[in-house]
Amino acid sequence: MCVKHIKKAIKDGEIPKGALREIRITPTRECLDTSDNQALSLMKTSFIERSCLMNSCRTASTLNIPCCEGVAFIIPEGGATVEGGWIRHCWNKKNGYYFDVTREYAMSVPVKEMYYFMIEEHKSIEYEQQLQSTGGIEFISKAVKFSDILNNYDG
């Protein structure tokens, strides 16, 4: 279902071809070495639901790794709802593996499946500079625009 939305949005010219790349998320403990897992275990209770960008930026800054911006399609466990299914989302990458601290440590909605489509990677310094100049952080990529577009397709 989610790939149908993307194909239609590309066909309609709403999203450029090649702008989204499906990626696979690996459990955090499988992506990180012992010292990184220890650093993350000290942080994980402070991760906040619906704050994926902040959670990913803090992880990136602590572990010196990139933030990955994109969109995700959520299929909740029986009966729970997620507005539209598509969300703008941010996760991390280390040694070629993608992992999502927000899903693992902060989401309260039980998720049956979650599909990830990456737009761009950014260094944590880019967000730190944004924070210093504007007082906040926002998605740098077109993740917000693309999630809005995809939520308007019926598939």
Predicted regions and their residues:
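A structural boundary/capping signal
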Residues: 1-155
